[in-house]
Structures are given as C-alpha cells and as structure tokens.
C-alpha cells in the first residue's frame, strides 16, 4: 500500500440505501475537488451542496461534499467525503469516476485506519478498537471497544513502557559505573523494586481469566454427558431451532455443534458434544476426544444426567458448572442430585431457568474484571513473553549474573509491550489486524 496513492471506497452500507458515503484520502484530493466538483473543493470542515461529475463531464449526482485538510482528518491526510444518493448506479459511477483519475485507486480493507495508524492518529490497540466497535453486537462489547478506542489500553501500556524505560536507564548506570564488577546494592534495590511492581501488575492483568477476550469473542459453554442423555435436544431448546440432529440412536452426535446466542448481555457460544463413553468406532472416538477438549476449554460446562438411566454421576464437575437432570417428565430411575436442575426437553420444564443460570454466570464473569487490559490473544501472548523477560532480568540481578544480561532482558520486555500498541516494527501484525476491517474503514 503506497502512501502516495489516493484511495477511495464506499464507507456506508451496501446499496441500495438512502445515502451513500464515498470516502477519499490522499494527495489527489485537491485535484478531485477541482476536477469533479462543480463548486470546487469546499472550505475545510464545511459541507457544500454541489454537483459531482466524472472526468468526461457526465453528471454523477448532486450531493454534499465535506473536506478535511491534513493533518486534521481521520487518516491524517487530505480527505474528502461525498454524500450521494445510495443507488447502485450512482455508487458505481462515482467510484469509476474517481479511479479514472491518475493516482487514485480503490482502498483495501482497513486501509483508511491503517493510514491513520501510520500517521500517528491512532495506535494499534485504538485501531483494533475501531474494528471492534464496528462489529459490536452487545452493550458490553461496545463499551469495551469504546474504552479501547479512547486510549484506555494505551494509557496502561504506555505507563509500563515509561516505567521500564526508567528502569533501563538505572541499569545503564550500573553498567557504566560498576563497583569493581559487582552490582552495588543501593543501585540494585530500586531496580528490583521497579521490576517487581511492573511484574505484579502484568500478573494481575494475565489473571483475568480471559474476560476481555470473552467479552469480545464470546463465552464458551459445553453441554457434556453420556450418549442419549438429551444433550442435542437441550441445545435445540436453547437455540429455539433444530441446530443439532436428534435421534434415539446412541452416538448420533460425532462432532461439536455450536450455536451463538446472546444471554445476560454477552455473546455465548453453546456447544453440543458427542456422548462420553468408551467406543471402538474410530469416528465416534474422535468425536469423544473433541468433546473432552471442548469441555476442557469451556468457561462453563452443563453436565447432563439422564433421569431414566442410573448412570454414574458426571466427572470433573467444577464449582461453577451446572448439572441438569433431564427427562424429568418421565418416571426417574434415580433421584436428582442436590443442586441439579430438573428439566424436560419434551415439555420445556426448566429450560428458562437453565437459560437464566447461564446468563447469570456470564454476567458475573464479565463483571469480575472492571476494565480488562487484554482484549485479544495477541495482547496476552506479548504480555506472557514480556513477563518472562522481566523475570529473567530480576533473576539476573538477584544472582549477580550481571547488569548487561538484565538490561538485555528489560529491552526484550520493552519491545514486547511496545509491539502491543504498535510502537515498534510489527508489519506482520499490521497485516493481520487491518485485513479484518471492512472496505471503507
């Protein structure tokens, strides 16, 4: 993506629509205003009603033009937005007219926001916040994205970076003014104190049980239990549709089937899994393996007991897990365990209560961390690596392995934290982040 190009794209929803917004950014904006707008380029931040023509003089539409001059724009470049009628023919003509001008091309996904990042208008976490707010479906997702877009994460990571930079300066003093090769205790003490403080804060951030990522991507709930206990029917009841195949044949479900719901104001992925049992069937055995993995990775497990089959109680039930006693409408062969929820997928008994229990769990989990520092897997990966480097730096100082080694470890940690917000070269990360944006953003 060459910065000298001028880019354009439809920034509003797909046609037909009442209004279409064509966004343009780059050095050719002034030429576009002069060539295509009947009234010329408007004054900065002033909307102008004008006729828009193509380079052959054919009328495209009558619309509103809004100009923002560099660096006072979203991208930091000269930008022009055209508000046109939202018919497909108008939009197609406008984009063809723009790209007919030398140096103007259609934008790639996320290219406007990438230019904003490259021009210092946003850092990488703020750019991710832009993508997240576009995709937000729940109030919790929107609030988290707005906080990130507003620099909430930047402030925290910049604080750590500033503290580490000061720590590195103290280590450099130790290197430049050694005391006969030993680390002076009065110099090492404040360095160790700084390192311990930052490490403690990072450990706290990493101990959030993935709340920020779950708010963004969705909480995971796995329905587990023996074959024919009614797991698929429970999924269908919760989904209010036939999401999973239901038969009387044990072992019908052989893969993980997921549905996406919004419960308790949070996105929740509920997975129906294969019945847990020993089997010689290769395909079913793979399904059981996947079921166990889904259960292990889930935030919450729904353990299903078949009330007509006195099978052993579920294994590995954690405190927050839910036990449901299915087929409560039939004559139970066993008594429901204490704390189990009696349900019937036939009559619907207990389904609403099960749904409310799931909603209560995800609501509690989402509110357990007031302001998550980690909202994506890449943030967690960098923090884990940064913490490892800081631990190595502390150990080097404590064991007298040398200030040089400690300094190098602190530099590594600083680089890891800086890469989260894009303060260092992260070209591979940029491609992954901005490729997920929509065209026009």
UniProtKB/Swiss-Prot annotation:
It is an enzyme of class 3 (hydrolase). Gene3D superfamilies: P-loop containing nucleotide triphosphate hydrolases, Probable tRNA modification gtpase trme, domain 1, tRNA modification GTPase MnmE domain 2. Mg(2+) binds at residues 232, 253. Its cofactor is K(+). Residues 218-363 form the TrmE-type G domain. (6S)-5-formyl-5,6,7,8-tetrahydrofolate binds at residues 23, 81, 121, 441. GTP binds at residues 228-233, 247-253, 272-275, 326-329. GO terms for cellular component: cytoplasm. Binds 1 potassium ion per subunit. It comes from the Bacteria. The keyword Nucleotide-binding applies. GO terms for molecular function: GTP binding; GTPase activity; metal ion binding. InterPro entries: G_TrmE (IPR031168), GTP-bd (IPR006073), GTP-bd_TrmE_N (IPR018948), GTPase_MnmE (IPR004520), MnmE_dom2 (IPR027368), MnmE_helical (IPR025867), P-loop_NTPase (IPR027417), Small_GTP-bd (IPR005225). Keywords: Cytoplasm, GTP-binding, Hydrolase, Magnesium, Metal-binding, Nucleotide-binding, Potassium, tRNA processing. GO terms for biological process: tRNA methylation; tRNA wobble uridine modification. It is found in: Cytoplasm. K(+) binds at residues 228, 247, 249, 252. Homodimer. Heterotetramer of two MnmE and two MnmG subunits. Belongs to the TRAFAC class TrmE-Era-EngA-EngB-Septin-like GTPase superfamily. TrmE GTPase family. Exhibits a very high intrinsic GTPase hydrolysis rate. Involved in the addition of a carboxymethylaminomethyl (cmnm) group at the wobble position (U34) of certain tRNAs, forming tRNA-cmnm(5)s(2)U34. PANTHER family: TRNA MODIFICATION GTPASE GTPBP3, TRNA MODIFICATION GTPASE GTPBP3, MITOCHONDRIAL. NCBIfam families: mnmE_trmE_thdF (TIGR00450), PRK05291.1-3 (NF003661), small_GTP (TIGR00231). This is tRNA modification GTPase MnmE. It comes from Hyphomonas neptunium (strain ATCC 15444). The lineage of its organism: Bacteria, Pseudomonadati, Pseudomonadota, Alphaproteobacteria, Hyphomonadales. The gene is mnmE.
């Amino acid at each position: 993506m060459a910065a000298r190009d001028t880019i354009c794209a439809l920034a509003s929803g797909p046609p037909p629509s009442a209004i279409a917004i064509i966004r343009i950014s780059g050095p050719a904006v002034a030429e576009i205003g002069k060539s295509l707008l009947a009234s010329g380029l408007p004054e900065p931040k002033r909307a102008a009603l004008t006729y828009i023509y193509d380079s052959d003089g054919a009328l495209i539409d009558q619309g509103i033009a809004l100009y923002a001059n560099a660096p006072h724009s979203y991208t930091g470049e000269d930008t022009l937005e055209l508000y046109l009628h939202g018919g497909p023919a108008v939009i197609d003509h406008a984009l063809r007219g723009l790209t007919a001008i030398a140096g103007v091309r259609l934008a790639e996904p996320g290219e406007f926001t990438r230019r904003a990042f490259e021009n210092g208008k946003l850092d990488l976490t703020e750019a991710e916040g832009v993508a997240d707010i576009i995709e937000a479906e729940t109030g919790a997702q929107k609030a988290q994205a707005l906080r990130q877009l507003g620099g909430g994460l930047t402030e925290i990571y910049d604080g750590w970076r500033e503290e580490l930079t000061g720590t590195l300066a103290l280590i450099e003093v130790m290197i430049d003014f050694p005391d006969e090769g030993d680390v002076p205790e009065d110099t090492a003490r404040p360095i160790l104190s700084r390192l311990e403080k930052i490490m403690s804060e990072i450990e706290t951030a990493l101990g959030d049980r993935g709340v920020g990522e779950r708010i963004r991507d969705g909480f995971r709930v796995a329905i587990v239990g023996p074959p024919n206990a009614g797991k698929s029917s429970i999924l269908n009841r919760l989904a209010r549709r036939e999401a999973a195949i239901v038969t009387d044949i044990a072992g019908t479900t052989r893969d993980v089937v997921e549905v996406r719901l919004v419960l308790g104001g949070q996105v929740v992925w509920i997975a129906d899994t294969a019945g847990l049992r020993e089997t010689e069937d290769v395909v079913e055995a793979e399904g059981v393996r996947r079921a166990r993995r889904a259960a292990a990775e889930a935030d919450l497990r729904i353990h299903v007991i078949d009330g007509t089959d006195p099978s052993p109680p579920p294994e590995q039930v954690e405190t927050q897990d839910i036990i449901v006693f299915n087929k409560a409408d039939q004559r139970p062969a066993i008594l429901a365990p204490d704390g189990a929820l009696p349900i019937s997928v036939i009559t619907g008994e207990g389904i609403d209560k099960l749904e409310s229990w799931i909603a209560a769990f995800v609501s509690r989990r989402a509110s357990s961390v007031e302001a998550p520092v980690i909202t994506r897997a890449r943030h967690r990966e960098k923090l884990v690596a940064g913490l490892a480097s800081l631990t190595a730096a502390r150990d080097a100082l404590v064991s007298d392995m040398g200030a040089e080694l400690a300094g190098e470890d602190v530099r590594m940690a600083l680089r890891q934290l800086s890469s989260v917000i894009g303060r260092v070269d992260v070209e591979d990360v940029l491609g992954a982040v901005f490729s997920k944006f929509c065209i026009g953003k």
